[in-house]
């Protein structure tokens, strides 16, 4: 299928056996939406009967010129529904939790910590494996450069997310519920082009954010650190012009050929001082794009071109499976 052009859509809701992670029975739904973030997913669906608490998987069934397929959109755990009565008809609004819900409900023992030098991805995966969903991680994970100490009331899930953030990686939850821990993708997952099967609706919001740009940066690589400052009175974002220091720290460092840590710090500060540019738009659903992915946008008529990192997504369970998302500019 060509997901950049129009297709018809219907939806299928199945129960899932947590022991095998396979589909079993059928359930009826009438609509709803899915919310996705980096490392998270939830759904709000309307059903014709009370499902109780059980694992479910929602599919998009797409058709296009005789071709088609079934794509998993969301897998999660149903919660207590809200019953709505209209005359003699009943419907149930059901909130569905992420596949990480079991790990969110387990508290770590007091004093737990992830030690400096440990494999961060391995530790995070072990914390999440209390969930029935399959959890995997990439094999080239960096080690923790400093210990991550659990806070009071820390859960398996929140600790796993803190460890993953500490190594500069991310958690991706696929539509089938599988969990993958890896570095943020460096290659584009899709291209949305006004000249080639335009999938984006005309309404876009383009936002520039300079307020959070740092003027001081500390970079950490192993036992070494370097700092860079912008004290230039001619720079609009400098400590002089803004009258205050705005710090940022980076622990995931990739040096260029013959580049020193100090030179890297200076270069990264300049890059981070470029005001963030965020677009928000609606488009047809594409199964290859999730929060944290890169997409290439080519809309030169409105000044939107380059690679953008997808943030939050909202997927409508309805006509065209419309997806609304925000994405922040990274590079050309």
Predicted regions and their residues:
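Polar/acidic, low-complexity leader/linker segments enriched in S/T/G and N/D
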Residues: 1-27
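Acidic, small/polar-enriched beta strand-loop surface segments
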Residues: 1-10, 161, 175, 183-320, ...
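Short beta-strand-centered interaction patches in the first periplasmic/extracellular domains
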Residues: 2, 86-103, 139-213
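Extracellular/virion structural assembly segments
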Residues: 22-58, 102-103, 107, 114-118, ...
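Oligomerization/assembly interface segments of phage tail-like spikes and tubes
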Residues: 31-50, 89-102, 219, 251, ...
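Amphipathic, non-transmembrane alpha-helical segments in extracytoplasmic/periplasmic proteins
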Residues: 41, 45, 96, 109-136, ...
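Surface-exposed cap/loop segments at beta↔alpha junctions
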Residues: 49-134, 331
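Short beta-strand and beta-hairpin "edge-sheet" elements
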Residues: 64-96, 172-173, 295-324
């Amino acid at each position: 299928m060509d997901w950049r052009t129009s297709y018809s859509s219907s939806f299928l809701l199945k129960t899932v056996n947590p022991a095998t992670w396979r589909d079993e029975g059928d359930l009826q739904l009438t609509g709803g939406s899915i919310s996705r973030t980096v490392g998270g997913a939830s759904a709000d669906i309307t059903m014709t009967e009370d499902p109780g608490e059980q694992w479910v998987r929602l599919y998009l069934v797409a058709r296009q010129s005789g071709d088609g397929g079934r794509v998993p959109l969301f897998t999660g755990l149903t919660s207590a529904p809200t019953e709505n009565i209209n005359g003699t008809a009943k419907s149930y609004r059901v909130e569905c939790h992420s596949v990480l819900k079991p790990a969110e409900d387990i508290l770590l023992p007091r004093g737990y910590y992830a030690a400096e030098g440990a494999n961060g991805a391995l530790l995070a995966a072990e914390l999440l494996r209390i969930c029935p969903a399959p959890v995997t991680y990439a094999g080239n994970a960096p080690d923790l450069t400093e210990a991550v100490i659990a806070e009071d009331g820390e859960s398996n899930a929140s600790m796993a997310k803190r460890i993953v953030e500490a190594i500069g990686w991310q958690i991706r939850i696929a539509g089938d519920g599988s969990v993958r821990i890896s570095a943020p993708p460096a290659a584009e997952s899709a291209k949305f082009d006004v000249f080639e099967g335009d999938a984006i609706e005309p309404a876009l919001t383009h936002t520039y954010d300079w307020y959070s740009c740092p003027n001081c940066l500390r970079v950490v690589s192993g036992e070494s650190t370097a700092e860079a400052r912008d004290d230039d009175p001619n720079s609009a974002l400098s400590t002089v012009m803004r009258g205050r220091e705005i710090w940022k720290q980076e622990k995931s460092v990739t040096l260029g050929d013959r580049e020193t840590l100090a030179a890297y710090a200076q270069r990264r500060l300049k890059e981070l001082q470029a005001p963030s540019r965020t677009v928000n738009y609606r488009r047809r659903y594409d199964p290859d794009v999730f929060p944290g992915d890169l997409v290439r946008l080519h809309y030169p008529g409105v000044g939107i071109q380059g690679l953008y990192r997808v943030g939050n997504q909202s997927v409508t369970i309805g006509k065209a499976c419309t997806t609304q998302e925000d994405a922040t500019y990274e590079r050309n």
